[in-house]
Amino acid sequence: MSKKSKNSSIEFDAIVVGGGHAGIEAVYALLKKKLKVVLITLDKKKLASMPCNPAIGGPAKGIITREIDALGGVQGKFSDLAMIQIKYLNESKGPAVLAIRAQIDKEKYSKLILKDLKKQENLLIIEDLVSELLVEKNRVFGLKTAKKQVFFSKTVIITTGTYMDSKVLRGSLAIPSGPDGQQTSNLLSNNLKRLGFELQRLKTGTPPRIFTSSIDFSKVEKEVLPVYNINFSFQSKHKLKKQISCYLTYTTAKTHDIINKNLGKSSMYSGLISGVGPRYCPSIEDKIVRFSEKPRHQIFFEPETKKQDIMYINGLSTSMPEDVQLEMVKTIPGLENAKIAKFGYAIEYDALNPLELKKSLETKKVKGLFMAGQINGTSGYEEAAAQGLVAGINAGQFVLGKKPVEILRNDGYIGVLIDDLVTKGTKEPYRMLTSRAEYRLILRNDNADIRMAKYALKSGLISKKEYLKIKAKYAKIDRKILELSKEFVSPKDELAKKYNLEKRISKLKLISWPNVNFKDILPDFEFGYELTVMARLKGYIQKQNSEAQKMIRLEKLLIPGDLNYEKVANLSSEALDKFQKVRPKTIGEASRISGVNPADIQMLLFHIKVLKMQKVSKI
């Protein structure tokens, strides 16, 4: 779309505020629905930037990226095009927690997205800051910017990441700034507060970057990987031909001494930071204090681009002053002569209390206003992208007058993520872990396509033809399973000799053995891995599916939207407070709210039953 001089004369379907991983997914979801979109970002050359580690995926997170792809999102597709290394994690722990992680050329990733967005119709990209949301009668209808521009729209999605009233902290310095020296503003924060939203201060951090030419690689361990024939995207045909290595080293006793002697200079320990940091990604200062018994901690060198001129020092996140960072870095094997390209820092920012949100990621206070990404209290590119995609889908549904799309916990990690946020809230940056999912045997890396298919079709992000292709894949697997149950291996067969079989056995039984290579039985079947996983986990999957059905029944028990919780007898005071704040839509949601016990749920069910009986008696 060509840029207009008077944007206030145009009404858009949606405005997306912020061009990070959440914002980009939201934009693509809206464009797929043929809607007219404005993307407001600080710097279009830094779309979906990676201010922290240059990687996508990891335990649970890699499965989220697969789900994003299956749901019609783009993170997996662009990761495949920009990856410089890819590998499986947790292979030895079984298929339930198997995940993909890729090192990404962060510069290429942003360039690919900008290049692709420039081709899109119905999109206007503006470099500006948002100063005020336009709200009337609790409904958003547009916004104003710092450059005095006004945009009108039917819906707004805020995906500001860590940029709202953010401060970069290093030692005693606290500089108003976003990540990577970008602009920040308190205008939107103040506007949200005036609208009655509850904000909280959160904190994250990043390590120093080192010029690769200054590293002594003879003192570190090189990660040597085979070339894996794997991708994030189910549609991708791009395969990595060469793996670029990462490197492993460790902190030393000298490193720990320097940190301990200078703890008071760290922004974290000087009292300069009030925000709560991520539990599962602590700073090096935190690690030394909390795990003082450990003689050393792992440090990984990760290339930021294919050029490999800068290394991200994973494991050394810090808010120490620059002189202390330099002293500390030089005590690490391989970094004795290191030259720092960019010093580490902590960043503190405003985030929304996610209890303010519906499962659609629309706010409860303002209709048509959606929130996604780190503003909702999460950490990580994958968690952000997942929320952006869901917010984009549902903002589109809102504009088109359709029902929101809400992913259940038993169908995806995306469902677990959003359900946790809107029912439990978070007081620290939330990171997805496999342990957060009750049904992780069902929520696997290999079956994300079929789990997301119905949601993608309902969202309009995949066609009926694409949906039927996914269904046909699993029908083919089911037919092959039936065939294998009727085909047998006798003790005289070559296959029997290889696996020391003493009696006749079905091929299905044989393939379910953990020591059997499925390619020996299915050399030419394209979905052999998926079939093998289903065969080996059959009993466990059936059990978890049964448990999931019980949860689904609770999700179907609706709570009246206008229910007066103060009239529910014998509720605990904590349950009353949480119910009034969260206002769960179903008994299933209510049961997962922290502080709510089974007795509270029983009283709630009884009260709803009485209300229904009273209504019937009046008829």
Swiss-Prot record:
InterPro entries given in the database record: FAD/NAD-bd_sf, MnmG, MnmG-rel, MnmG-rel_CS, MnmG_C, MnmG_C_subdom, MnmG_C_subdom_sf, MnmG_N
PROSITE patterns membership: GIDA_1, GIDA_2
One Gene Ontology cellular component annotation held by this UniProt entry: cytosol
Source superkingdom: Bacteria
Known cofactor(s): FAD
Subunit details: Homodimer. Heterotetramer of two MnmE and two MnmG subunits.
Record-listed NAD(+) binding positions: 277-291
HAMAP family from the UniProt entry: MnmG_GidA (MF_00129)
Gene3D superfamilies in the cross-refs: FAD/NAD(P)-binding domain, GidA associated domain, C-terminal subdomain
One GO term (biological process): tRNA methylation
Name of the protein: tRNA uridine 5-carboxymethylaminomethyl modification enzyme MnmG
SUPFAM superfamilies: FAD/NAD(P)-binding domain
